């Protein structure tokens, strides 16, 4: 599902996606490009951190953009000629393929809560999905990463993310009034949420489809000053305080994690060939869908981050993520 761009291929100076010959607009981000612009390096002169699997070495933040109109149920006009775009995604006038609104979308339910979901430049579609909700100071974040070699995982991951959000959106259960009872009730709720995600992704395709869709899951609920979280697969939840050390809250279900448990240094394990092979997932062929569940108390301001390996693959350690946040110099979540 991935490919390595040829050295001579033209790439978008804004997002790094491959460009069609003589393209005037990037099909990935929709921004205008010209013959000179397309061949030129990015304005910063810094190498793109997405060129390889090395850690991020430069700030990658960029101004946020609104979600494409098509994501809300209507198609934007053709970027090449302004003509109408048909349901098949192609312009009815010039035949140019329109950017898929699923390739890049954003959500910001509150000024201090937001998310960006992007197609990786080496993938032909965006298989990540996210869902979030805000109710006063209470926040729910959900991220699902579709498994590339399964059928319709981009659809299944989105279905799963929203099914999980629906379960976690109401106030958390209080149990019988004692901490042990409340913890047990919350663990049960996260298990129910994972089961809802499992049903949603399984319903994406007919029963007889071989290699049905599957995805990872992480979810976090910030309730008062406590973060409750769960995980299946190798998507992650990080707590990154403004002061003090950051934490990776979740534990991956992956071959890399098995190597780490066996004594392999994290950087070496995460760079291994099978690093991103997951050992648990949501999907019809999953043997186990019980998530790892945990909680942590928040002691000061900072960031709660839910992400797929599309982000952490380039900045795995909390310190590397904090360097990016600090260098960006913004409190805008987008």
Give the role of each language-model region.
Residues 1-334:
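PP2C/PPM-type serine/threonine phosphatase catalytic domain
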């Amino acid at each position: 599902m991935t490919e390595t761009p040829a050295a001579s291929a033209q790439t978008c100076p804004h997002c790094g996606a491959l460009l069609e010959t003589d393209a005037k607009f990037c099909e990935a981000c929709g921004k205008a490009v010209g013959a000179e612009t397309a061949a030129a390096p990015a304005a910063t002169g810094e190498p793109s951190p997405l060129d390889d699997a090395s850690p991020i070495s430069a700030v990658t933040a960029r101004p946020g953009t609104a979600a494409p109109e098509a994501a809300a149920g209507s198609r934007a006009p053709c970027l090449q000629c302004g003509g109408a775009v048909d349901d098949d995604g192609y312009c009815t006038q010039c035949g140019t393929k329109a950017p898929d609104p699923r390739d890049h979308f954003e959500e910001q339910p509150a000024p201090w809560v937001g998310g960006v979901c992007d197609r990786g430049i080496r993938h032909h579609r965006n298989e990540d999905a996210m869902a979030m909700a805000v109710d006063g100071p209470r926040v729910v974040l959900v991220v699902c990463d579709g498994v590339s070699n399964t059928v319709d995982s981009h659809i299944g991951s989105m279905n799963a993310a929203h099914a999980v959000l629906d379960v976690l959106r109401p106030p958390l259960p209080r149990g019988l009034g004692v901490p042990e009872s409340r913890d047990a009730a919350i663990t049960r709720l996260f298990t129910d949420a994972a089961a809802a995600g499992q049903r949603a992704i399984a319903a994406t395709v007919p029963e007889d489809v071989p290699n049905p869709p599957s995805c990872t899951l992480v979810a976090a609920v910030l309730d008062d000053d406590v973060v409750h979280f769960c995980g299946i697969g190798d998507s992650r939840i990080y707590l990154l305080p403004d002061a003090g050390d950051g934490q990776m809250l979740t534990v991956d279900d992956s071959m890399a994690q098995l190597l780490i448990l066996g004594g392999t240094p994290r950087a070496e394990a995460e760079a291994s060939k099978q690093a991103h092979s997951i050992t648990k997932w949501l999907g019809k062929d999953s043997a186990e869908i019980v998530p790892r569940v945990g909680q942590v108390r928040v002691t000061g301001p900072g960031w709660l981050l839910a992400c797929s390996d599309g982000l952490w693959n380039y900045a795995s350690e909390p310190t590397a993520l904090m360097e990016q946040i600090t260098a960006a110099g913004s409190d805008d979540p987008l």
